[in-house]
Curated annotation (Swiss-Prot):
Keyword Cytoplasm carried by entry: no
Pfam families: TruD
UniProt-annotated catalytic positions: 81
Cellular component terms (Gene Ontology): cytosol
Signal sequence, renumbered to the chain: none
Name of the gene: truD
Family listed: Belongs to the pseudouridine synthase TruD family.
Protein name (record): tRNA pseudouridine synthase D
Keyword DNA damage in record: no
GO biological process: tRNA pseudouridine synthesis
Top-level taxonomic group: Bacteria
Length: 347
């Protein structure tokens, strides 16, 4: 599989250590956190599943059959990796109060467990989660000491908040199709396909901007015209507040943001605008797709700082525990630590 991110910069240089990722399903564990309580009643049955070696779409389709409903009646907040052990909620539109008998479904699929159920008044929609908790094992690590040094840096500075390879499809196909659609002015009623390509387009331009800041030693430097996050507030950096905002950033109170391109003007100014505009201009096909679909500009933090990061060493294995907000990629953490060893998975 092609690494679409291969050309992008690293925070501390490309890792020298190698390791296997997801050598076993239990080496990549994910627990979804929706961040809200269910109402306890309503037309939607909420089903907490634990799946091993299965993808979310497959489980949702099979759960729909078990409940006697159509696939479109089962929804989720986020897609979870197949090569892993993952816990997440699925919602099933079942207006009747009875909970189906899942015994035949569970007997057919021993790789799927139903942990609990509840009732809610709304179905789950993509993005209806606050984040995920991870337990990741790096196995057969070739240089444990180097990875431990890098972990100290990650704990202090975070990592580039890149969108991972998953966003760009197998071998970057979604990104290539996004460019083709923009270049050829493709119009499609396939909303899911259009959403995938638009997402790939904006994500790639964002990644280029973050990589450039790293290459220019501006990853932790506040620029004139930057947009900074302070909680839910956005601050514009001017000549008058530049020094003060850099101090607040250094103290950990502010976050530098990068562009998620839209058809409206960038809100950045001065030096920050000049840096970002280069990459919008460099991708005319992607921008044609974005503008043609009237996407509005948005912002995203350029640094990803995992919460509750800890690690332990077990021989030549390193076990990582951390939490990420929704929309962030665990692969961005791993990318800064090791080069992945290619191997044939048996699951």
């Amino acid at each position: 599989m092609t690494d679409t991110l291969a050309s992008l910069a690293y925070l501390a240089g490309k890792p020298t250590a190698q390791a296997k990722i997801k050598a076993k399903p239990e080496h990549f564990q994910v627990r979804e956190d929706l961040g809200f309580e269910f109402t306890g009643s309503g037309e939607h049955l909420m089903v907490r599943i634990r799946k091993t070696g299965e993808n979310t779409s497959f489980v949702a389709n099979e759960l729909a059959k078990a409940c006697g409903v159509k696939s479109k009646d089962v929804s989720w907040a986020g897609l979870k990796d197949r090569h892993a052990v993952t816990e997440q909620w699925l919602s099933v539109h079942l207006p009747k109060a009875e909970t189906p008998d899942f015994s035949a479904f569970l007997a057919q699929y021993p790789s799927i467990e139903i942990l609990t159920t509840a009732r809610h008044n709304k179905k789950l929609r993509p993005g209806d989660l606050v984040g995920n908790d991870f337990v990741v094992t790096l196995s057969e690590v070739s240089d444990v000491d180097d990875v431990l040094k890098r972990l100290e840096t990650v704990a202090k500075l975070g990592v580039p908040n890149y969108f991972g390879n998953q966003r760009f499809g197998n071998n970057g196909n979604n990104l290539q199709e996004a460019k083709r659609w923009g270049r050829d002015n493709v119009r499609s009623r396939n909303q899911n396909q259009r959403s995938l390509y638009l997402s790939a387009a904006r994500s790639w331009i964002f990644n280029l901007i973050v990589s450039a800041r790293l290459e220019q030693s501006l990853f932790d430097k506040v620029l004139l015209g930057d947009i900074l996050f302070k909680g839910d507030e956005q601050l514009l950096v001017s000549a008058e507040n530049h020094a003060d905002l850099q101090s607040q950033y250094d103290a950990g109170d502010l976050v530098i943001s990068g562009a998620l391109a839209g058809d409206n003007a960038l809100p950045t100014q001065d030096d920050a605008l000049a840096l970002e505009q280069v990459f919008l201009d460099a991708e005319p096909d992607l921008m044609a797709l974005i503008r043609g679909n009237r996407m509005r500009h948005d912002r995203r933090a350029i640094a990803l700082k995992p919460a509750n990061l800890s690690w332990q060493v077990d021989g030549n294995n390193i076990i990582l525990t951390f939490s990420l907000d929704a929309g962030s990629f665990a692969t961005s953490i791993i990318r800064e630590l090791v080069q992945e060893i290619a191997f044939e998975r048996e699951f």
